[in-house]
From Swiss-Prot:
Domain of life, source organism: Eukaryota
Protein's recorded name: Angiomotin-like protein 1
UniProt region (Disordered), positions on chain: 196-248, 277-317, 381-407, 413-432, 775-826, 842-952
GO CC annotation: bicellular tight junction; cytoplasmic vesicle; plasma membrane
Entry's Gene Ontology BP terms: actin cytoskeleton organization; angiogenesis; establishment of cell polarity involved in ameboidal cell migration; hippo signaling; regulation of cell migration; Wnt signaling pathway
Biased composition range(s): Polar residues: 804-817, 898-911
Keyword Nucleotide-binding: no
Gene: AMOTL1
InterPro entries (UniProt xref): Angiomotin (IPR009114), Angiomotin-like (IPR051747), Angiomotin_C (IPR024646)
Chief place where the protein resides: other
Organism this protein belongs to: Bos taurus (Bovine)
Amino acid sequence: MLMLHVKRNTCEHTFKCPPPACYSPSSPVQILEDPSYFFPDFQLYPGRHEASLTVEANSSIREKVVEDPLCNFHPPNFPRIPEVEMRGSEDAAAGTVLQRLIQEQLRYGTPTENMNLLAIQHQATGSAGPAHPTNFSSTENLAQEDPQMVYQSARQEPQGQEHQVDNTVMEKQVRSAQPQQNNEELPTYEEAKAQSQFFRGQQPPPPPPQQQPGAVGHSYYMAGGASQKARTEGRPTVSRANSGQAHKDEALKELKQGHVRSLSERIMQLSLERNGAKQHLPGPGNGKAFKAGGGPSPAQPAAKMLDPRGPPPEYPFKTKQMVSPVSKTQEHGLFYSDQHPGLLHEMVKPYPAPQPARTEVAVLRYQPPPEYGVTSRPCQLPFPSTAQQHSPVSSQNSSVSGPLHSVPLPLAPPMALGAAPPPPAASPSQQLGPDAFAIVERAQQMVEILTEENRVLHQELQGYYDNADKLHKFEKELQRISEAYESLVKSTTKRESLDKAMRNKLEGEIRRLHDFNRDLRDRLETANRQLSSREYDGHEDRAAEGLYASQNKEFLKEKEKLEMELAAVRTASEDHRRHIEILDQALSNAQARVIKLEEELREKQAYVEKVEKLQQALTQLQSACEKREQMERRLRTWLERELDALRTQQKHGNSQPASLPEYNAPALMELVREKEERILALEADMTKWEQKYVEESAIRHFAMSAAATAAAERDTTIVNHSRNGSYGESSLEAHIWQEEEEVVQATRRCQDMEYTIKNLHAKIIEKDAMIKVLQQRSRKDAGKTDSSSLRPARSVPSIAAATGTHSRQTSLTSSQLAEERKEEKTWKGSIATGLLLGKEHNDHASTPLLPTPSAATLSPPTPGTSASSAHAKTGSKDSSTQTDKSAELFWPGVASLPTRSRLSGTPSNSPVLKHPAAKGTAEKLENSPGHGKSPDHKGRVSNLLHKPEFPDGEMMEVLI
């Protein structure tokens, strides 16, 4: 079974081929594909040759390898199977089976087959090289020592799997191979190889010898391929090395005991017998010396450059250094070439891949050092070469062996080996034996046979590739079908579950409908039975129905009658309701008329009362006028008497008797004029005080009535709330209550109108009095003379008070004093009480002025009476009379009141004095807003106030 391991960076592509095709017992030699079939323009050691043609070939093949390794492994028409990767216990078992088959064939096969199979076994199990095929850099590693690291790092990118071997494993494998190299006692093959190649290079070899070494080279490549397949098996690396060591020891033991030698060993012996003692190339001893110590040196740098990504897949067979003569000769060839790196460059140049485009490379001459071992020696390569040195074709095949397995192998159709260019003619001194040429010819014949067999195997492999591709497609299709089947199973399961649920639901519905149908049938049967039973009672039911129908007709007639009666009752009730409404309206109208008539009656009564009061006031005024006339008469008589007394005094006086009559006449005239002016001023003051008294009384009465009205309204609202809260009242009581409220409101309106009328009357009276006073003053001013120095004031209340004391002393009685006290109490109890009491200090301040004029006037007549009178006039002018001040307005009020006759003897805090004082102050304060009354009414009131006797307190309110 052939395992071709392909590496593409980190991907592994493992292709299994049937074992009987490659490793059949009848195969004389193991075959690995000739590189000329796959890489027609391939050149070993790329980048190290001076020939441009070789460099071109090398770069082209490198590009092929790097760009598409899988495509390089097989021709483009082959089907690619990138994912056919089969590893594990199967491959390991296949490798074990391969070992058993080889051992079995060694026991029972022919000597030639045993020789080939033994080479295969030793190559697969006992090689000391690394377990992976080397790339370009590992091949270059064999040609030079110092620059090999650079070439390795530069050429390792296209491959990925060969970096996965541990460095320690590499060193162990190399060290395990060294004792076998030293213990091998076979003669060195390098000398014979180099010698025969050198001699043969001087003359063109015949075609049969060219084919025979090619066959050997191919057998060697096939051994490498077997080891490459063995790499792909999954075994531990150390165990592979140990097992390979054990197999190698067994093979050495068999070889030393006299078993059949391999073909390469015979070629080596023949070449040594003929040419070994004659020709000595420089440095064969050095090549031997490298056997012990120089062997592992190329392996270690190659192992050091590996990528530390872990070990590769473990395979059962490690390619180690062969103990067989084939492996030994290869090693010696390598070590010899290590001593001559300069010759290696020129040795590789003459062997390009056999192709028509590269035939001109054959002009290059051969070099004597044998570098074939270097190209075929893969110290770490899994395919050592055997007899490749005997022909340029075999050397070229072996030179391509390193890259052949480091890159994917393209399966190309085999090409003729005869296309290789003939080497240039060698020197005539070098000659080769006839046995060597015969061996080469046989080898080339075997190469042709094996090439044909390889072509057949390639065709079979292509068929297997096709089958594998089909199988892969079948697997994909099968996977797709399985996935579709799984999805179908899932959907079918789901549908079945849904169908089952629906079926259960429908079955339940069917059962329910069956039960319902059964119930309906039972009901129908019972209904039928009841119907059949009722048919017997049909006659009785019909008779009862007739009776009920007649009764129903009667009831309907009665119902109609009742409805008619009900309609009549409803109409009557509506008429009654309308009549009631009409009566209510008439009652309300009558009540309104009654209210109006009551209001008119009240107004008429008020007018009647007013007329009566006015008549009383008129009579009082008339009496007052009469009394005034009497008082004037008395005053006149008193003044006449005083005048007579003064005249007599002047007559009896001693001083100025002559001028006295002249003086007395104008002086008396002036005195009379002044007295008259005083009288007029006093009358004006009295009128003003009367007006103010009337205004104050009206204000007090209005305030009292307003307070009473507010209290009545409050009581009315309380009663309204209490009556609205009670539910048992009738509509008649509500009407009565509304009427009472209307009456009260009308009364209040009438009172307000009366008060306004009184105020207007008072204002009219005041203005009439003012007009009269002004007219009198204007007349007096026109009739005055130029004696204005004797007129200090228009009015002197002290004289008026003094003159009134004698005439009115006896006019005040005890009853009048009691009435005045009563009026004082009522005035103090009114709303304006606080205002009157607050002004009492004016009484105390002005009372000391009261006795002064009394004393002055009541004193006996003295010569200084006129002087004292003048003093009193000036003092009274400063502190009192007509200037609208409190003291000025006080004295005329005292003189005009009936109590002024006793004011001199009345204490300051007596109610007689307090009453007019408080009244005057209050009148002044109340007069400031301008409460006016009609002058006629005021004149009547002023005349009435001069009456010595007042009827009562109610009469005072009426006068107001």
